[in-house]
Amino acid sequence: MEVLGLIKKYKYQLFITINLLWIWALLSPNIYYFDDSYRAAGGYYNWGGDFRPFSDWLYYTIGMGRNFTDLTPLPQILALGFLYSIYFLYLKNFTHKKMTLTNLVVFIPIIWSPFLLSNLYFRYDSIFMLLAVLLSVLAIFEVNHKKYIRAILLLFVALGFYQPAIVAYVCTALFIIYKIEQENKKSIFKLWFKKSAIYFSVFLVAILLYYFLVMKFTTDYNFYSATHSQMAIKNFIPNVIQAIKEISIIFHGDTGSIYLAIFFYLVLLNLIFLIQKVSYFGLLIFIVTHLSFIISAVGVNLLLDVPRFEYRTFIFYGFYISYLLLGTSQLLNQANYKKYLYMILFFVTFYFYSIALNVSNAQKSKKDFEDSVMINLVQDLYEIDNCNDCYYVFLGEYNPYIVHRLIDKYPVIMKIVSSSGYYIYKMQNYFPVQLKYRKFVNDIDKYNFFEKNVNLYEILKQDKFYTIYGNGENIIIYFKGDGSYR
């Protein structure tokens, strides 16, 4: 185990080097991610219409006025600072004072979660998304210090920045419950119930305050917020099932199947660990804890009629995997089992790390390809007569073969690098006037619109990568790639 000895000896140097490479991979594509293009080309913020008014205020402050400003890479760097602050808070509060290699690695999934890449690639949104996560984590520790008003204020502000981030509050509460299980064997049920009740009460008060003081009176409803604000209890089970389906993409592919086996092994070890610690009451804790993580996966989509399951809303995932690894590290923290522990830690963290590097390369390849195709598309659109007031509809997506190969290996990459729903924003950069586009509740509605009308439209332009249809009122740009609808 000479190699392991060297890793332990130089663990801090390795930690810094590997994380710097991960950060470089994240920042190096230098892309306009999703609706970054919309904000950059349109010159306005408009997060308030998505129930995030504090985000507008933040950019009015750092941008020194209402006019749009692009401070990249500063927002992403600050977002990374917030993210690593969460990591070190977890190290401080949930490990022993002695810093071991295991402790350093256990909480890495909080940073390297593949789903979190969808938050970090935003050159504008990332700063307040991760700030909201940090505030949600800090709120829990304020509750522990019995500073309830401060905790409510932190959650209130987090909600004003990015509502899905508050699942970090729930996840951190579950870690503290885990700590209680370790340190208290007497009256554990009473203590566990009391803590849970306090955490929930603070959480509920913050949400109610935000709803009645901000959402109900100050939100300027737009198409997105109006569409994604209708709720019903009947949506609970279907939305939970849909969230699990979306997250299960992480287990697809050849490497993903190995990760799936390890994941179930971690869940089993977590159950064994809890039963060892608190007898059969551990089974109840196991069920409640994992159900809580599942509900955190659904997050703000829990009761929505039209949920929006974007990867950026799955903030819980890194916390959940770290929770499983923490219990496993306690159970296998013996000389006879440590080699198995190191194997598990290495595979899980390298799997996440590899996805991040592959996403970075996919983003670069896709950006180069889309830039060249977009120039041709813009030229074709300028040649179309009498369509200054047309509405645009983009359908499908074309991925270069390099990106296809990476997606075959790691299917989770596909939705991270997908940009089909945001081509209209990329297009705006080439037109001096605001383009109009058809709005749809979801992709199914868009595809139905296409199927219903395509035979009534004239083919205006044909290209290897796309077809342009038109009828004088609408322009449909259909991309022909394997990622497309047809």
Regions found by a protein language model. Name each.
Residues 101-135, 160:
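Aromatic- and kink-enriched transmembrane "portal" helix at the membrane-lumen/periplasm boundary
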